[in-house]
Regions:
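Pocket-edge structural micro-motifs
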Residues: 80-81, 92, 104
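A surface-exposed partner-binding patch
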Residues: 1-84, 132-135
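Compact, glycine/acidic-enriched structural inserts
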Residues: 104-132
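Broad, structure-driven detector of short, well-ordered beta-strand segments within folded domains
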Residues: 86-93
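Aromatic side chains
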Residues: 5, 9-12, 63, 101, ...
Length: 135
């Protein structure tokens, strides 16, 4: 994975390297399909495993599969998912760099064939700030 990550995401990885949040977390976003406010949770942040180790939540494996199947653009880093299986990604290049998107695994963008992407935040820091504990 030859990608330059934003400093906020690098710091997050150094502190936690992903995994399941200790508390049930959610965030709000505007659903691009309905143009209405919606919310979802964080099931898991994907993990960077040491070379030779892997699991279903291996960030390198997940990104390889998502990109080779044409589900997300090459300049997206899928770094988490929600409990419905919707990937959460960050643009790491090109237009909208560093923005965070929720990808609807059931809907396809008719223009490019990728999963339909709803903007969540303009940066990883903003994304983290938008998270709240589910009561």
């Amino acid at each position: 994975m030859n990608t330059k990550f934003p400093e906020a995401y690098v710091n997050f990885l150094l502190e936690s390297n992903g995994g399941t949040p200790e508390e049930d977390l959610a965030f709000d976003f505007i659903d691009i399909a309905s143009n209405k406010k919606n919310s979802t949770d964080i099931r898991e942040f994907y993990i960077f495993y040491p070379e030779g180790e892997s699991s279903y939540d291996d960030i390198i494996k997940v990104n390889y599969i998502m990109k080779s199947e044409g589900l997300v653009p090459e300049e997206c880093l899928v770094f988490a998912d929600d409990s419905a299986g919707n990937p959460i990604c960050m643009k790491t290049g090109g237009e909208n760099q560093e923005r965070i998107f929720l990808c609807d695994h059931e809907l396809e963008n008719a223009n490019n064939g990728y999963l339909l992407m709803s903007k969540v935040a303009d940066s990883f820091n903003e994304f983290i700030e938008k998270l709240y504990i589910i009561e």
